[in-house]
A protein has these predicted regions:
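Short, well-ordered alpha-helical microsegments
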Residues: 77, 104-105, 169-172, 269-270
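Radical SAM enzyme [4Fe-4S]-AdoMet core and its adjacent flexible, acidic
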Residues: 42, 113-114, 122-124, 129-255, ...
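Cys/His-rich metal-chelating microdomains
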Residues: 25, 29, 36, 256, ...
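Conserved alpha-helical substructure of the radical SAM core
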Residues: 1-114, 118
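Generic short beta-strand
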Residues: 92, 259-260
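Flexible mid-to-C-terminal extensions adjoining Fe-S/redox cofactors in radical SAM and related proteins
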Residues: 1-14, 248-250, 267-323
Length: 323
């Protein structure tokens, strides 16, 4: 049975969803990391400050009004304040995905001052032991929770992101209740996709469950009157479920047309998952050698090699490696 049957992305109806992995360096080495990020990698970013600033300068003319920065751990990129400053000056909205570990009160206040639109903090369990095991760090849970609280205190919009593992599956209600108790207004749940380190840890990838989306939608409606807004993007068969207010997965492939991805080495692709599956095939160019404007001229040729609908996506045949 295929691991992925529907697109995981919820791209905007117009414009692009730009996801930029600004570094592969990370203070953690999570068992399910799709980028194989690690503290053993070099801390100096592969994309220089000059190249990064040049890229951001191009975005308004391309009609790209926001971007999501991830990693690795984006808060550990030394020049991040300069990137945020330029983005703010140009009116490019910034969303940030982080493990929460580096967030102190001072850093949370700096993120608010920089105008970051939302910080998504990863929390994979309401149980410290389980989260720390996945994140491979005995302090990961406490630091993530501290990061959540500091962002909330500073007035930074916060979302919690959780990866549904087989262990978390029977405890989803307790998990959502815990996050709600922290005062978090938004929660998004996903399943691990078998690329990167997750491909070598198949026990973290649950079997497709047609009833999971319905269960999550039940939780979503339970909290609709008060509590966190719950969303999910499972990448597995969601059984046609599409809770009110949740943008449906695209029926047609959005790679390169409404989705753009930039890897930590500067490679540009139309879809992060396709790129991680086969970088050579899906690489459009590299921002250290070409402008994004020039790179995007290659999208039509890439699109010609892909099926029009998501049913024929190359990712549908990806399976987790067996031990």
């Amino acid at each position: 049975m295929s691991s992925v049957e529907h697109c995981r992305f919820r791209p905007p109806r117009t414009g692009h969803l730009l996801m930029w992995e600004v570094t592969r360096y990370c203070n953690l080495a999570c068992a399910h990391c799709c980028t194989d990020a690690s503290p053993l990698l070099r801390r100096t970013p592969a994309v220089s400050t000059e190249s990064a600033l040049r890229l951001i300068s191009e975005l308004p003319a391309l009609g790209i009004t926001s971007m999501t920065l991830s990693g690795g751990e984006p808060l550990l990129r030394p020049d991040l304040p300069r990137l945020l400053d330029l983005a703010g000056h140009l009116g490019v909205g910034v969303y940030l995905n982080t493990n929460g570990y580096p967030i102190t009160r001072r850093r949370a206040e700096a993120l608010r001052a920089a105008g970051v639109r939302m910080v998504t903090i990863s929390l994979d369990s309401h149980r410290a032991e389980d989260h720390n095991t996945i994140r491979r760090n005995p302090s990961a849970f406490d630091r993530a929770v501290r990061g959540i609280r500091e962002c909330l205190r500073a007035g930074v919009p916060v979302r919690v992101s959780g990866v549904i593992t087989p262990d978390l599956l029977p405890e989803l209600e307790e998990y959502v209740a815990f996050v709600a108790g922290l005062g978090v207004p938004r929660v998004v749940l996903n399943t691990a996709f078998p690329v990167g380190r997750a491909r070598r840890n198949p026990a973290l990838v649950p079997s497709p469950d047609p009833g999971l989306a319905a269960h999550l939608d039940t939780l979503k409606h339970r909290y609709a009157a008060g509590g966190p807004q719950l969303d999910h993007s499972l990448g597995a068969d969601e059984g046609g479920s599409n809770g009110a207010g949740r943008t449906a997965a695209p029926a047609t492939c959005a790679a390169g047309t409404r989705i753009l991805h930039i890897a930590a080495n500067g490679d540009v692709s139309g879809c992060s998952w396709l790129y991680k599956l086969d970088p050579g095939r899906f690489r459009l160019g590299n921002i250290t050698r070409s402008s994004l404007t020039d790179i995007l001229r290659r999208v039509p040729a890439m699109r010609a090699s892909l099926p029009r609908t998501t049913e024929g996506c190359p990712l549908t045949d990806v399976e987790a490696e067996t031990a």
